[in-house]
Amino acid sequence: MARQPPPPWVHAAFLLCLLSLGGAIEIPMDPSIQNELTQPPTITKQSAKDHIVDPRDNILIECEAKGNPAPSFHWTRNSRFFNIAKDPRVSMRRRSGTLVIDFRSGGRPEEYEGEYQCFARNKFGTALSNRIRLQVSKSPLWPKENLDPVVVQEGAPLTLQCNPPPGLPSPVIFWMSSSMEPITQDKRVSQGHNGDLYFSNVMLQDMQTDYSCNARFHFTHTIQQKNPFTLKVLTTRGVAERTPSFMYPQGTASSQMVLRGMDLLLECIASGVPTPDIAWYKKGGDLPSDKAKFENFNKALRITNVSEEDSGEYFCLASNKMGSIRHTISVRVKAAPYWLDEPKNLILAPGEDGRLVCRANGNPKPTVQWMVNGEPLQSAPPNPNREVAGDTIIFRDTQISSRAVYQCNTSNEHGYLLANAFVSVLDVPPRMLSPRNQLIRVILYNRTRLDCPFFGSPIPTLRWFKNGQGSNLDGGNYHVYENGSLEIKMIRKEDQGIYTCVATNILGKAENQVRLEVKDPTRIYRMPEDQVARRGTTVQLECRVKHDPSLKLTVSWLKDDEPLYIGNRMKKEDDSLTIFGVAERDQGSYTCVASTELDQDLAKAYLTVLADQATPTNRLAALPKGRPDRPRDLELTDLAERSVRLTWIPGDANNSPITDYVVQFEEDQFQPGVWHDHSKYPGSVNSAVLRLSPYVNYQFRVIAINEVGSSHPSLPSERYRTSGAPPESNPGDVKGEGTRKNNMEITWTPMNATSAFGPNLRYIVKWRRRETREAWNNVTVWGSRYVVGQTPVYVPYEIRVQAENDFGKGPEPESVIGYSGEDYPRAAPTEVKVRVMNSTAISLQWNRVYSDTVQGQLREYRAYYWRESSLLKNLWVSQKRQQASFPGDRLRGVVSRLFPYSNYKLEMVVVNGRGDGPRSETKEFTTPEGVPSAPRRFRVRQPNLETINLEWDHPEHPNGIMIGYTLKYVAFNGTKVGKQIVENFSPNQTKFTVQRTDPVSRYRFTLSARTQVGSGEAVTEESPAPPNEATPTAAPPTLPPTTVGATGAVSSTDATAIAATTEATTVPIIPTVAPTTIATTTTVATTTTTTAAATTTTESPPTTTSGTKIHESAPDEQSIWNVTVLPNSKWANITWKHNFGPGTDFVVEYIDSNHTKKTVPVKAQAQPIQLTDLYPGMTYTLRVYSRDNEGISSTVITFMTSTAYTNNQADIATQGWFIGLMCAIALLVLILLIVCFIKRSRGGKYPVREKKDVPLGPEDPKEEDGSFDYSDEDNKPLQGSQTSLDGTIKQQESDDSLVDYGEGGEGQFNEDGSFIGQYTVKKDKEETEGNESSEATSPVNAIYSLA
């Protein structure tokens, strides 16, 4: 027959029946034992110490107690016996000490005010309640008063005083207008904690309403209103601005006292124009961020749950643009008594020893007073078995007569604590608390525990026997726990039998028997296998099981981890599952579960269903797919203590099958409104059993997922709250670290809603010093930190943090090692030795400090060093201190990156978590001469085709005595490289002119500075490309990448670019010609870092590019790359790439040649941007960085705005083709002048037409009667110039202007009458009119006119 589970009371008895620390006995919760055993009284319920009642209701003063026999009750009022029988209005409830004062028949509640105390008594002692102070709530009326209008100057401060009537409890104050509208408050107008209304400065709009102070009384639910204030504001032409001044509190300093555990409220209200801002600070530390909050527009600082470490000086700073003032508030934290060790009930057996401990703390230190049965201990009869030692009472060899109730009253000026603890002496023979002759069945090879709860006084000893014989079972495969349970670590067949537990004390013994049966395990020996089947076929899944024949076997099947519904198409047998006519919905995982009442085994297989080959293509596949619709109609069923079934109706899949469902939950205690993932289920289910945590008010929703995406969440389900339980885990990440030298802050990660398991989650914090193994200190904390004060410096502690709620405590936590606070080290490294290794590095060696002087964890040795001066005269150096760290307990190290040729000083310290220790003796050393840095601003200019001008500046860091410069240069043309030439210059020379030997080639220059040690870092530049280097082509400008080296060299951007790295890598020429209207672009490959570019980049020589682009690969981390600049003469377009999120803002920073820096903020998605108001021909450096993090920046690039012609072109006046053209024109003009001069001096004959009607042709030969004196060759240039310049005028296209004239001696006219007229006698005016029409058509005249 199967063993029935024991009733719940057995588990309770099992947990509570045994002894606790110090040999004390806990009485089990078994009602029969509770009713049988005698017990002194214990107060179980009482009213609050300050008990305020509503005068309209009856007065109720609670007092309830338990004990055996049941206690009787009586009261004192104002320390005198209160005779209830004499007052008809006062009665006491039956079986209770609660007082009821009834005023239905009249009477005034005020007559019963006073201090009450309840006494609960039986024959074994008397328990006391707290002293309950009864007060009747009061809501007095406002005194009548006439308020004159308040006249105030505009901009002046103003305080409207409320002065509410004193109420009990104090009323809530608020201000209203005459129209019953709340007064709008802001940082200018606000209500103080005292109820007054403060105006930092009055404005005209303030007199548009009246101001009335209102007091709301809590108990009577009444509101009293003060007569309203009327404001009259006097206006002025201009409100003068004023520095702030404090309206409350007055002066520059004040003090405030607060009790531990209460809220501290500090307030500062200031006046001024404009309205001041208020800021709060704490002297010597930060405000406690976890419990400090600002109120009333930063005018009030509230610190909740004040502790001793919150004492100190706080100050508020009021400031506006006219100035600032501050007020210091000295805060003192006092404390009413609070428990360190509250006395607990003590149950002993006759002759046993025990103790009551009453330990409390407070400020000032509280006093402890012991009482017994309500009387001072000094007045009680002497007891030789009792000894009082301050806060402890020690009992030795207790007897039955020692039973009593002890009271511990600890008090100081701020309050008191009263605790009752009884001492009960019991002599009870052993008793068994579990049913007799239980049957326990277990599975072979498992672990099991046999329980035998018992009770007795004195505490019995328990032993186990098997089959009524043999020795006590303990050791080997058996283990007996302190509570008496017997554990069998691995069950074997031979362990089957009858086990007897025997409990014994001096009063007798009791025994019980447990019968143990061992069963074979359930095993699946033939498991179902994964299968692939076509739709419409039959599938069989096997599941063959072996089990104990005495146990009933049940075989069930799950599909996708949910119970499988066996329909008409399925057949379930003992060893298989058959599916007929397989369909797509049958696809999924199948689980065979073989179970008995003791154990189970399971096996899984996956069924894949393929579509039939003859099945036509799904016509839905062509339809557009979308995210599924939200699930709907969520329903909770099968409500259990730790689980619930959630069912939903799927939404439309929108042509894409639903693959998964995600169930989310929300709880309304810890994170209301925040949804968390609970579990995930296949898309084929629409119901799931959800495992729940205790004491969570759940609400669920479901999200469907397909290949397109997730649906909108479903509407939430109804809420379901689970019952509570003790926590099953403890908080994690427990740490102990000091924040000051004399404390240790214990912190942990608080538990969330699903691990709290009950209301009022709190944490029991325990600690003790690791070395001393002293008793544990403990405190209960509601937050996630606790500060242990008055600790030695850097001492290890054992720390435990245990979760607890109203249902009980969590499991016993493991200890964590923490350390108290560190103090500054007390010693410095000694015997510091410095050895100069080279011009930039030294080695250090020192002796370690003693460990006891570190006063903390030794983090590192640190060297502070600074450059005192340079050995070069008149060279200013920065004396900024630098540091080098040497982590761990080391004795030597190296300091590098020093400046050569300099005097240095060095000190060493030891560093712990607190900071630096004292400095060692200062050591001085000198670094030898080194090589200089690169020359600055190396510039290459080409004024003409014959020379190249070089200019540079001295190195920024000479690093020694400069002896000169070395210039190396070489000519190159494509892949051809000439011979390298080396020039040496004096240290004062900063210019050099190179005479070009080849006007076609370009030059590469490398310049470095020298000291006695050698040459320093070199800088490389190239001459611009000549303009005739390119071949005609319409291709856009293309440039190979150039790597920017440490010198900051940037490649040229001429029409034909030759890319050369700073390592002198030769790249083939790519000839291109760029149209003059298209800006060329230089591409520079570099690596983006998250720091600003090196200064050498910003000091790079200005390039002659029209546009600059930084081409880089996109890194994994957040970066900015591929910055592109397309400049014109007065503006430039900027673009870049980045991998920041959307909405990121950037800043473009650029600096011109005059070192003027400007920034342009760029809103998100605003690329490209345009920089305007630039100067033509000026060099700029530019970078782009993130507005949120300036450290994430692009590489610094350099560009130049364009001029009338680009700088890389030679001067046109020096070009050979231009000079040749000008010489040809000058020669032609000279020839024409000579011809004209000869003609003018000699004259000539011109051919005239032979017949009037025939015009003179340009190729006519000279006639016999009219010919030139020049030869035919002389006339050819004139004839040849008769044709128009464009070659389009034909012979017959010009009219002869002289065709109407006859022949005569004056006929010396050619077609240009104006020419002849200059050298012959003119005709009459009538004869010459009309001849001028041929003047413009004669090219000969044009040439002659040049003469």
From Swiss-Prot:
| Residue numbers on the Cytoplasmic membrane side | 1239-1347
Q: Where are the transmembrane segments?
A: 1218-1238
Give the matching PANTHER family.
Answer: NEUROFASCIN, PROTEIN SIDEKICK
What positions belong to coiled-coil segments?
A: none
- Record disease entry: Neurodevelopmental disorder with central and peripheral motor dysfunction: An autosomal recessive neurodevelopmental disorder with early onset and a highly variable phenotype. Disease features include hypotonia apparent from birth, poor feeding, global developmental delay with absence of reaction to touch and no eye contact, infantile-onset progressive ataxia and demyelinating peripheral neuropathy.
Name positions with the PTM Phosphotyrosine.
Y481
- Mind listing the UniProt keywords for this protein, alphabetically? Cell adhesion, Cell junction, Cell membrane, Disease variant, Disulfide bond, Glycoprotein, Immunoglobulin domain, Membrane, Phosphoprotein, Repeat, Signal, Transmembrane, Transmembrane helix
Supply the SUPFAM superfamilies for this chain.
Answer: Fibronectin type III, Immunoglobulin
Q: Where does it mainly reside?
A: membrane
Q: Where is this region: Disordered?
A: 713-740, 915-934, 1011-1040, 1090-1111, 1248-1347
Q: Which residues form the signal peptide?
A: 1-24
Pfam families (alphabetical) = Bravo_FIGEY, fn3, I-set, ig, Ig_3
Residues on the membrane's Extracellular side span: 25-1217
Protein's organism: Homo sapiens (Human)
Give the protein's recorded name: Neurofascin
